[in-house]
Amino acid sequence: MADDKKHDEKRDDEHTEALRLQLRAKFDDVAALYDAVRPGYPVELYDDIRALSGVPDGGDILEIGCGTGQATLPLAQRGYHICCVELGSELATIARHNLAAYPNVEVRVGAFESEPLPEAAFDLVVSATAFHWVAPESYPKLARVLRPQGAIALFWNKHIAGAVDGGFFDRIQPIYREHVPEFAGDWNGLPSADELPDETAALAATGLFGPFTVGRYPWVARYDAMAYLNQLNTYSDHLALPADRRQRLHDGIANMIDGEFGGQITKQYIAVLYVAQVR
């Protein structure tokens, strides 16, 4: 029985890893839409990256998963030399176009885990709403590519509870339960800012980096039905749905936005930044 259990656990791990690899590649299928609708990050976040990381003026930055350059452009505008590693070839093509005015930026197509990168070559590693796709087995590589006193800055836009949404995200749960019950789960409402999980726990446990300093930057976005559905169409789990199920789900959501929320909803976000020095 013990051997059977180990076999089942190995099979589950392999399935989880295969699903992770499948989902993280989905964004390239909608690269143009991703570029059009994915949000950036508050200006204050970039100011704090500089202050907390100690990255020098004109310093060398490695960005993991640049997408189409949502976070790259503000860093390029600050004069840093940036090497971007992006898994999706279509995303990388758009990123190169968006960053064409900045010869200090290079966009490579590849996965961080396997991309050949020089050791001790960067002052800062950054990743914007992408680091959760990195395989933990490659965490030591983060430390190897950094210079002494180098740092890592990881940040995400997170959807949190807020009175500004008028209860919309509670109201759409029956639509998810009807059309995509595997997404609904046990809905207990959106988390508050204080209830968000620590995205750096696994990395911190390696001991490769010093204690993380955390910055939080709340902001809101407003969407009509089409804009909100476009946003959903850039989420890997929605992209993985069969087209007919996704369409029924989206029809139900659009009908609620237009019929019960006056054609517009507001979404409360918080950008969360984690910065630590390499040890």
Regions found by a protein language model. Name each.
Residues 2-57:
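Conserved class I S-adenosyl-L-methionine
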Residues 123-137, 158:
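A short SAM/SAH-binding and catalytic strip from SAM-dependent methyltransferases
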Residues 4, 68, 189-279:
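Conserved Class I S-adenosyl-L-methionine
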Residues 58-59, 120:
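Nucleotide donor/acceptor-binding cores
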Residues 138-149:
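A short glycine-rich, Lys/Arg-flanked "PGG" loop and its adjoining helix->strand segment in the class I
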